[in-house]
């Protein structure tokens, strides 16, 4: 992640996500669920506040208005980092796969709940950007 630049994307995905097929670089975190991984990553990863949205999740197939438990947990983590007002959007499954394919890296977690996937757009690290 240190090699990532402004605008690069990072996918944090569940254990059932086809990370090896989709990801250029796969980071395995089998001992952490996706919200825990997100929480840790946000301590060193500023989100891009110049794009809307900088956070993308995966839409529930057949029910685009549903909010799965992992997404509720992602929102709680974002709120805990002072990012609760940040807009985010859900992508359809294959659109999420395409974005993950273009991501700098895919972090495959041990998350077993469905739809435990989130994409982050990296912001700028500078002396004016407080790290969460």
Predicted regions and their residues:
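Glycine-rich, aromatic-bearing surface loops/beta-hairpins
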Residues: 64-132
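Gly/Ser/Thr-rich active-site loops/lids in small-molecule metabolic enzymes
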Residues: 26-42, 131
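Ordered, amphipathic secondary-structure segments that act as subunit-interaction surfaces
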Residues: 47-73
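C-terminal catalytic "cap/lid" subdomain
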Residues: 27-34, 49, 107-111
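Long, hydrophobic N-terminal alpha-helical segment
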Residues: 1-28
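Short, basic, glycine/proline-bearing loop/turn elements
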Residues: 23-26, 57, 78
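Sequence-level motif detector for i,i+2 pairs with an aromatic at +2
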Residues: 7, 53-55, 102
